[in-house]
Amino acid sequence: MNTFLWILLVIIALLAGLVGGTFIARKQMEKYLEENPPLNEDVIRNMMSQMGQKPSEAKVQQVVRQMNKQQKAAKAKAKKKK
């Protein structure tokens, strides 16, 4: 019976570590993406140039603000959903 108890405790500890690690990794990834968004001003300027638009600073800043607003709305919606 003692061996069975040890095996059960090891399995429970592994499952708890897996679940905990998943949540910690998810939070760290969300924080990283919030601090370092994949699309920055330089990327937006480059995309506008490739589409044939002249990337004025006002247009670039408008797109950046829209993206930030959408990210905040999506984050708020996700928190509300929980």
From Swiss-Prot:
Could you list the residue ranges forming a coiled coil in this record? Answer: none
| Any one Gene Ontology cellular component term annotated for this protein | plasma membrane
Keyword entries, A-Z = Membrane, Transmembrane, Transmembrane helix
Topology in the lipid bilayer is annotated as: Single-pass membrane protein
Q: Where are the transmembrane segments?
A: 4-24
The subcellular localization recorded is: Membrane
Family label = Belongs to the UPF0154 family.
The name under which this protein is listed is UPF0154 protein SMU_1719c
Identify the species of origin.
Streptococcus mutans serotype c (strain ATCC 700610 / UA159)
